[in-house]
Every structure is written in structure tokens, then in C-alpha cells.
Amino acid sequence: MNEKDLKALVEQLVGQMVGELDTNVVSETVKKATEVVVDNNACIDDITEVDIRKQLLVKNPKDAEAYLDMKAKTPARLGIGRAGTRYKTETVLRFRADHAAAQDAVFSYVDEEFIKENNMFAVETLCKDKDEYLTRPDLGRKFSPETINNIKSKFGTNQKVLILVGDGLSSAAIEANLKDCVPAIKQGLKMYGIDSSEILFVKHCRVGAMDHLGEELGCEVICMLVGERPGLVTAESMSAYIAYKPYIGMAEAKRTVISNIHKGGTTAVEAGAHIAELIKTMLDKKASGIDLK
């Protein structure tokens, strides 16, 4: 028996053991299994939209109700579970997505259309770009003489209240909160009989920029709304720094601060009403910061 006959015999025996297979059926099955299905209307869920306060990834928790009750009180990453000794894929992806959002908030700019829509007069500090803004904080507190003159011609001097918006370290915070916060401030001031001018927008802005403006313009109260350094909890946190007659070299303790203005903290509308009340108090007591106590 030669090799060819041996091969034929083996094929015959195998065929008898497993049954003859229809090659056409096999081909069709393989084709269906490997066929690519494309759904043009489908999309991947945005992982950052998941409320981690309501998400429990621990497998078979002893007391899930108590765990969720604890998570509801903090945005901390609790109950994220493990795959062996490692984080789960969903946990890692959410961490990276939140980190990316924080980076984007720092390195992006407030949209020019947004500035126009909110009727803000835009200027910028001495910083030329974002890199210089991050590495030279001192330049983010100063304005050129030309810029100061432009501001004076637009807003005048010796104003009672100046509302200032600075991009700070989070452009996302400004775009997310300003439309609700500013109207609440203006409405509150109007109730107290206090006039507020147009809004000044400052690009590459540090908190100390209000000191330079206070000294040059002679405003009684300056309220600065500025994007705060983003973190993994949120990239949309805004703060309000308010000072009575700010000047260059003013101690930080003389500023009154309302922080964590975002949808997961103090809401923009609530913060706006509180800011208006604080401005009224500062004008009455002619003080701010710890001097207001």
C-alpha cells in the first residue's frame, strides 16, 4: 500500500466516524460567522456620562445598600471592584477619560462665539500663549498700557461694581456655568439697586489680574469669575473671587471666595444669588475677606 492509498483509507475511516460534512454548509457557516455587521445609526455610550455615585462594580457585595448610600455622599471612586489584582477595564477607561477632560479644559480656550453671545468685552493679559500662561503666572496678572486704556475707554473709572470673567485654568468651567451665573448676579444686584456694567472677559487670566484693574480703574468692588484647576471629579468647576477696592500686593486674605461652582457642587444660579448678596454686604461694610467677619 503506497502513501496515496493510505491517505485515502484514513479519510474514509474519519468520514465514517464523524459523518460526511457538506462543504457548502461549512462555507456558508464560516461566511456568516465572519460577516461584518455595520449599523450606521449605532453609537458607543459616553463613559463620562455615567454617574459614578450610583455605580457599584464590586461583585457580590455584602451590603450593597450601605455601599451605595456611602457612594451617594461623595464623588470619590469607591466600590470600583477588581479583576484579580487589577482595576476593571471600565474603571481604567473612566479614569483616563476624566484625566483627558481635565487636560482639555486647561489647554483649550473659551470659544469666541461664546464671548460674543454673552456680550463680553474681551482683552488679554501680557501672556502670549497658553505655555507662557502656565509657566509665567506673573504675566497673567498684568496688562499692557494699551489694554488698560482700552478698558478705561469702555468701562470708565470709579465704578461701583465690575464683573470680570477670566478663563483661568478651565475654559470648560466658564462655558458650563457663566450663562446661569451672570444673570443671577445681575438680577440680585438690580434688586439691591446696584447698577452693573457690561462684562469684561480676560484671556490668560490669573486671579491677581483683578488687583491691577482695581488699582487702575478705581472700582469699589470687583467680582472675578474664573475657571479653576480641573481635577478627576470635574473639569467644570468655577470660582468667584470678590474684593473691596483691590490693589496690587493685596493680601489673599482680603478676598472673599466662593468655590466649587458646578452642577455637582454649588449650582451656578445659587452661587450667583449669593455673590450679589456678598457684593451688597461689601459695599455696605466697605470691606472684604477676613475684614468682613
Swiss-Prot record:
GO biological process, alphabetically ordered: amino acid metabolic process; ethanolamine catabolic process
Cofactor note: Binds between the large and small subunits.
Enzyme class: lyase
GO molecular function: cobalamin binding; ethanolamine ammonia-lyase activity
Cofactor(s) the protein needs: adenosylcob(III)alamin
GO CC field: ethanolamine ammonia-lyase complex; ethanolamine degradation polyhedral organelle
Catalytic activity as recorded in UniProt: ethanolamine = acetaldehyde + NH4(+)
Signal peptide (UniProt feature, chain positions): none
E.C. number: 4.3.1.7
Major site of localization recorded for this protein: other
UniProt: adenosylcob(III)alamin binding residues: 207, 228
Keywords, in A-Z order: Bacterial microcompartment, Cobalamin, Cobalt, Lyase
Pathway in which the depicted protein is active: Amine and polyamine degradation; ethanolamine degradation
InterPro entries given in the database record: EutC, EutC_C, EutC_N
Entries under Pfam families matching the protein: EutC (PF05985)
Protein task: Catalyzes the deamination of various vicinal amino-alcohols to oxo compounds. Allows this organism to utilize ethanolamine as the sole source of nitrogen and carbon in the presence of external vitamin B12.
Subunit: The basic unit is a heterodimer which dimerizes to form tetramers. The heterotetramers trimerize; 6 large subunits form a core ring with 6 small subunits projecting outwards.
Protein name in the entry: Ethanolamine ammonia-lyase small subunit
Taxon lineage: Bacteria, Bacillati, Bacillota, Clostridia, Peptostreptococcales
